[in-house]
């Protein structure tokens, strides 16, 4: 099997441009919008209303996160669909974007990536309408996705209020595990649990979030848990108190980060939030909380009275959840 991870400098969402750099790139632009534009740049996806239908649009493309091309295609697809779910939408159709070195890699590898993507799209009942390919030395695959909000409402990062609970639906640490895989320290069978979680769609988490009348939501991916939590805080003009011992993560990721094995994106993410961070935690814990996750879970806020129904609802929907903290008045990230 070709080691896809050896063909790229960074893997998965760890290859994203850091949040600080992205902020600098977009600074000062006057981006055109019209009266139908409900959400533009700055959230997980764009939202646009047309003929009474609320549409959600996003694009996500990643480098390999595993060496198996089928799994990479499926994980990349789940990752791309996630932003639609985070906005409260349901994906409808998609366009594929693929960068592939067809001079050096067997075409069957490319076909396996597509097969993985098609199977995941079928699971999500999302139609592939076409796509675009580029001959490129570093392989990349992803999707541009369009979805709708059938309930007639959408969720953004800006609705959280003081005194609410922070809910997370998948463990963190995948970026660190992928780094271990890329460095040859781990094998794919060592991270089977993480692979299964990356493959899992966020459709059930979306249904849980809506059932609990979530006030704000994002998906935890390349900017890390702290980076995405800060986006909710910044956009909602509140703060958050996160309890490290309540945050789910893979034990192997702790082992690796203590050995200084983690993607550089974790440090970029931590630097992005350091001016808003209040914490006396060990540095390895903060790095883990800043890990650039691929195909992570949803992070959302709910009123405390919703606790009465969260267990029953999550059980009915067959989705995991963890209460990792609460929102506070001070516009900071307090990590205990």
From Swiss-Prot:
Write down the chemical reaction(s) this protein catalyses. Answer: hydrogenselenide + ATP + H2O = selenophosphate + AMP + phosphate + 2 H(+)
Pfam families referenced in this protein's UniProt entry, alphabetically = AIRS, AIRS_C
The enzyme's first-digit EC class, named in words, is transferase
**Per UniProt, where does Mg(2+) bind?**
44, 83, 219
UniProt keywords (A-Z) are: ATP-binding, Kinase, Magnesium, Metal-binding, Nucleotide-binding, Selenium, Selenocysteine, Transferase
Cofactor note as given: Binds 1 Mg(2+) ion per monomer.
Which residue positions are annotated as catalytic? 13
GO cellular component terms, semicolon-separated = cytoplasm
Q: What is its EC number?
A: 2.7.9.3
Keyword check for Chaperone, yes or no. Answer: no
Q: Name the cofactor(s).
A: Mg(2+)
**Which residues are tagged with the site Important for catalytic activity?**
16
Q: Which domain of life is it from?
A: Bacteria
Record-level Gene Ontology MF annotations: ATP binding; magnesium ion binding; selenide, water dikinase activity
Q: Where does ATP bind?
A: 16, 41-43, 60, 83, 131-133
Name the GO terms of the biological process aspect.
selenocysteine biosynthetic process
* Family note: Belongs to the selenophosphate synthase 1 family. Class I subfamily.
UniProt xrefs under NCBIfam families: selD (TIGR00476)
Subunit composition?
Answer: Homodimer.
Q: Which HAMAP family match?
A: SelD
Q: What does this protein do?
A: Synthesizes selenophosphate from selenide and ATP.
Query: Know the name of this protein?
Result: Selenide, water dikinase
Q: Which gene encodes it?
A: selD
